[in-house]
Structure formats: structure tokens, C-alpha cells
């Protein structure tokens, strides 16, 4: 089974950045978000994971930059939009901008009834981001705790969630390898598809994730590993085939 790869473009204050463990203030600046996204599209990406960090942290938004990327590149690549989607207005804006899929994080924990209604309405165009420390969920830009992972999944499964984007916060941006055990535990407890996020630092990490395909891990988000040139997207796509 092949693995779908989603190069990440995280946007803060109008720039493409990478964070360490999701912490505000730990940014490394990588320049223009549009140029970053275009680089990955030209290198063969079929999906882009586009994150508005300001919206996630409640420090504003980067809608203009995100809209430019979706408008200019949306006919060449599928875009998964994440960050600050927690009500009808922000969800509608993301979908109307042309996102193929929208990733809901904090709202899934703070407003389960709303989350259930949008999963029912939009189906597989809505994924739920599970940002995890141990077996505890992190909420609102990873600054607060949001409850037990598996209890939350039980509810989300019951309302028909079709995809989880699973991030081990301790691994994210640290180039220390993905949490294969966590990914396995999540995938084995749900019929939903699972996207792996956080910690991928070498091609062998992708090979390890690919081995989980038969239990439902069908995709992986690539962030710092690409920006730090640990490997090229072309090399990763070859492994993912």
C-alpha cells in the first residue's frame, strides 16, 4: 500500500515557519508561504498541509496568504487547511476558499456537538486533529489539556469521523522519529483513516509508518525534515509508493 505525503506549510505573521514542539516563540523562518507551497507542488506533492498558526494560537490570522495559496495552486494540488477552525464562520471560510479538506482541532474538544454536526454535514472533507501528550489531548495551540485521547476518539467515532491527524506534541519539529506506538494504538481502535504527523526525520521513519498502512495509517505530514533538507520530497515520494 502506498502512503500519501503532505508537505506542511505553517504560516505565522505572514511567513512560513516551523515550530519546536508546537511552542509559540520557537519559530524558524522559511520565508514566503506561497513560495514554500509552490516548491512542494513542483516537486510532486499531491497534497499540502496548510496551517494558520496565528489562528490556532488566537493571535490573528493569515487568511490573505492562505487564500493566495489555495487560489493559485488549488487546481494543481489538494489542500488540507488547519488552524483556528472552530465555528461555522471559520469552517465556511476554509471550504469556500477551496480547501479539499479542513482539519478541526481545538473545537472538537471544546464543542463536541458542533463538531458532530459538521462531520455529519461535510463527511470526509472534515478531519479531526488529535494533538497528544502521552494519552492526553492538547487543546488551543497546544497550550492547554483537552481530555483523554481514547474517550474523545470513542465519541468522534460514534458521530462518523472519517480521519484523524495524529500528532505527538513531544515529537513535533524535533526530528526525533515518529511515535509508532501511538499511531498503532490509534489506528487499531478506529475504522477512520489516520494521518501521521510529527517527528519524521529520515526515510526509514516513512518506511516504519508505511508498515502501518494495513491498519489504517494511510498518510504522513512532512515538516521540518523537508525544510532542514534531511531528505528531498522526491526521495520521500519514492519510499511512499
Curated annotation (Swiss-Prot):
Location of this chain's protein in the cell: Cytoplasm
E.C. no: 5.3.1.16
Positions annotated as active site in the UniProt record: 10 (proton acceptor), 131 (proton donor)
UniProt pathway: Amino-acid biosynthesis; L-histidine biosynthesis; L-histidine from 5-phospho-alpha-D-ribose 1-diphosphate: step 4/9
EC class of the enzyme, as a word: isomerase
InterPro entries for this protein: Aldolase_TIM, His_biosynth, HisA/PriA_Actinobacteria, Isoase_HisA-like, Isoase_HisA-like_bact, RibuloseP-bd_barrel
Key words of the record: Amino-acid biosynthesis, Cytoplasm, Histidine biosynthesis, Isomerase
Pfam families linked: His_biosynth (PF00977)
One GO biological process term: L-histidine biosynthetic process
Top-level division of the source organism's lineage: Bacteria
GO molecular function, one term: 1-(5-phosphoribosyl)-5-[(5-phosphoribosylamino)methylideneamino]imidazole-4-carboxamide isomerase activity
Name the record gives this protein: 1-(5-phosphoribosyl)-5-[(5-phosphoribosylamino)methylideneamino] imidazole-4-carboxamide isomerase
Catalysed reactions listed for this entry: 1-(5-phospho-beta-D-ribosyl)-5-[(5-phospho-beta-D-ribosylamino)methylideneamino]imidazole-4-carboxamide = 5-[(5-phospho-1-deoxy-D-ribulos-1-ylimino)methylamino]-1-(5-phospho-beta-D-ribosyl)imidazole-4-carboxamide
GO cellular component terms, semicolon-separated: cytoplasm
Amino acid at each position: 500500500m502506498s502512503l500519501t505525503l503532505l508537505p506542511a506549510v505553517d504560516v505565522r505573521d505572514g511567513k512560513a515557519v516551523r515550530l519546536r514542539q508546537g511552542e509559540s516563540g520557537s519559530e524558524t523562518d522559511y520565508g514566503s508561504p506561497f513560495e514554500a507551497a509552490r516548491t512542494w507542488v513542483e516537486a510532486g506533492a499531491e497534497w499540502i498541509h496548510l496551517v494558520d498558526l496565528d489562528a490556532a494560537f488566537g493571535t490573528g490570522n493569515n487568511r490573505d496568504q492562505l487564500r493566495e495559496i489555495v487560489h493559485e495552486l488549488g487546481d494543481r494540488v489538494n489542500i488540507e487547511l488547519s488552524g483556528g477552525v472552530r465555528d461555522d464562520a471559520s469552517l465556511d471560510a476554509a471550504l469556500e476558499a477551496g480547501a479539499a479538506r479542513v482539519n478541526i482541532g481545538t473545537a472538537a474538544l471544546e464543542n463536541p456537538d458542533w463538531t458532530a454536526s459538521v462531520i455529519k454535514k461535510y463527511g470526509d472533507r472534515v478531519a479531526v486533529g488529535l494533538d497528544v501528550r502521552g494519552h492526553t489531548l492538547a487543546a488551543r495551540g497546544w497550550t492547554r489539556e483537552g481530555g483523554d485521547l481514547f474517550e474523545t476518539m470513542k465519541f468522534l467515532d460514534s458521530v462518523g469521523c472519517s480521519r484523524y491527524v495524529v500528532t505527538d506534541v513531544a515529537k513535533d519539529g524535533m526530528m526525533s522519529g515518529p511515535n509508532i506506538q501511538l499511531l498503532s494504538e490509534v489506528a487499531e481502535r478506529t475504522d477512520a483513516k489516520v494521518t501521521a504527523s510529527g517527528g519524521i526525520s529520515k526515510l526509514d521513519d516513512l518506511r516504519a509508518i508505511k508498515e502501518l498502512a494495513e491498519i489504517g495509517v494511510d498518510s504522513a505530514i512532512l515538516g521540518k525534515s523537508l525544510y532542514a533538507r534531511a531528505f528531498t520530497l522526491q526521495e520521500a515520494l519514492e519510499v511512499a509508493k
